[in-house]
């Protein structure tokens, strides 16, 4: 059964001849354009294909072509960025190019549904990294040499498996398994099935690969071209544990449904009522920047709500339509008791207990020493309603909220707090569904 499912998955994961011809035609066209512009620049050494296209591990549903422009290592950072962008814009000018940002800017365009990236990097020896993209050409050479044809197909299957189940992508929004990580896992373990077997029995902090260093992350994956680099450091604990659970389920009861899109639109009303959604608009910026900011904002607000007595079960974030974002919080309850117990020091600690009594005596409804000799006080909460508290926190105490400075101007222009059961944007609705529903693929009892 399992072998039959893996065989069927190839029809989804492996491109057909029509798709191959389409991407090859565009790749050759664009490479010629980029190479022509690069030859005009004395700082450029050479131009190469990179990424999944060059390694033959690309999948049909997302067609990308990466073209790397190698610069002399003596090129200044300013010229590296300026000339890199010029080559990208001049070569792709017919296709409405635009700038995207990683550590350094690169130029991207869409050509008949195929994403084309023109990425600058330095011509250096292995280990002499000057920019984040410098390793990429070494990755391409290594994987092109080491991966067999069947292993490349298994990389494609693994990518599709992770994409469909929400664990694929290195961007901050996802914090999942990157395309290169998929290649590395298949390189180390030999096949898609072996990767799942390894993940199903994974121990905390287990290392895949070899390194002289020790790393602290739930999953350690050593970059085969840089033994001091842990590729697993960027993968969230949620994605690691979800992969473990799904791998166990697939090996126990395989199904092609693991490779097919699932509906995420159902929203349990009971839990939706206990969900708060903070909506706001922001000035346009890169996805990595906005997601880094809204994730920090959600984490800080969650901590503030817990301090105030509201039990936050889960939180999430989503950015959409280029200038809109939402922070989502699932609470145990939106309202809590007006009474709050605050614990103090032991009576035997003379100075501390005296100070506690002085500070709390006026606002206390009741004060006593419990059976362990600790002081306790019953007080009236400032807030009984989570939405009321959250509104006041953002509106009147923004500087103390923990929301990053880079977002505060956006919040000052306005925000709105909705309940999870209210009518929502499609992207927000999908995020609410993910937040408050059990993923049956991950948590199957079969």
PLM regions and their residue ranges:
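N-terminal regions immediately upstream of nucleotidyltransferase
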Residues: 1-60, 74-78, 107-108, 121-124, ...
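Catalytic micro-motifs at enzyme active sites that drive phosphoryl/nucleotidyl and oxygen chemistry
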Residues: 51-59, 94-99, 104-108, 171-173
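Short amphipathic alpha-helices in soluble, non-transmembrane regions
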Residues: 81-87, 341-346
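Short secondary-structure junctions
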Residues: 35-48, 92-96, 303-311
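Conserved nucleotidyltransferase catalytic core and NTase-mimicking acidic/glycine-rich helix/loop elements
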Residues: 150, 155-324, 329-342
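Extended, charged low-complexity segments
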Residues: 323-446
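Conserved catalytic core of two-metal-ion nucleotidyltransferases
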Residues: 82-129, 313-326
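Hydrophobic, small-residue-rich alpha-helical packing segments that form membrane-like cores
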Residues: 58-63, 67-72, 117-149
């Amino acid at each position: 059964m399992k072998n039959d499912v893996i065989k069927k998955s190839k029809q989804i994961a492996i491109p057909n001849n029509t798709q191959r011809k389409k991407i090859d035609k565009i790749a050759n066209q664009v490479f010629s354009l980029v190479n022509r512009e690069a030859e005009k620049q004395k700082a450029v050494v050479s131009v190469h294909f990179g990424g999944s296209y060059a390694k033959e591990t690309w999948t049909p549903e997302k067609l990308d072509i990466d073209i790397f422009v190698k610069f002399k290592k003596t090129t200044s950072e300013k010229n590296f960025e300026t000339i890199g962008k010029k080559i990208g814009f001049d070569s792709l000018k017919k296709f409405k190019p635009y700038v995207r940002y990683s550590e350094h800017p690169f130029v991207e365009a869409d050509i008949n549904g195929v994403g084309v990236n023109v990425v600058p990097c330095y011509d250096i020896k292995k280990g002499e990294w000057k920019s984040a993209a410098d390793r990429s050409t070494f990755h391409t050479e290594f994987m092109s040499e080491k991966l067999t044809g069947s292993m490349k197909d298994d990389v494609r299957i693994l990518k599709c498996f992770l994409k469909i189940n929400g664990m694929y992508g290195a961007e901050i929004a996802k914090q999942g398994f990157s395309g290169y990580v998929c290649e590395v896992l298949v390189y180390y373990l030999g096949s898609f099935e072996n990767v799942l077997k390894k993940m199903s029995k994974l121990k905390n902090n287990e290392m895949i690969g070899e390194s002289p260093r020790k790393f602290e992350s739930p999953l350690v994956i050593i970059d085969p071209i840089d033994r001091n680099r842990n590729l697993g450091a960027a993968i969230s604990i949620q994605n690691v544990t979800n992969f473990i659970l799904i791998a166990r389920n697939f090996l126990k009861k395989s199904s092609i449904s693991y490779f097919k899109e699932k509906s995420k639109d159902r929203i349990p009303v009971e839990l939706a009522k206990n969900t708060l959604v903070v909506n706001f608009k922001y000035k346009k910026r890169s996805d990595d920047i906005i997601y880094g900011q809204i994730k920090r904002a959600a984490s800080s607000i969650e901590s503030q709500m817990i301090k105030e007595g509201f039990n936050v079960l889960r939180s999430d974030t989503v950015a959409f339509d280029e200038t809109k974002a939402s922070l989502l919080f699932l609470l145990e309850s939106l309202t809590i008791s007006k009474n709050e117990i605050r614990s103090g020091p032991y009576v035997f600690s003379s100075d501390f207990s005296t100070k506690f009594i002085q500070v709390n005596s006026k606002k206390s409804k009741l004060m006593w020493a419990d059976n362990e000799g600790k002081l306790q006080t019953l007080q009236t909460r400032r807030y009984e309603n989570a939405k009321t508290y959250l509104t006041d926190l953002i509106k009147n105490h923004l500087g103390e909220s923990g929301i990053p400075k880079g977002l505060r101007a956006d919040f000052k222009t306005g925000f709105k707090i909705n309940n999870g059961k209210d009518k929502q944007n499609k992207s927000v609705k999908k995020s609410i569904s993910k937040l408050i529903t059990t993923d049956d693929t991950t948590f199957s009892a079969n």
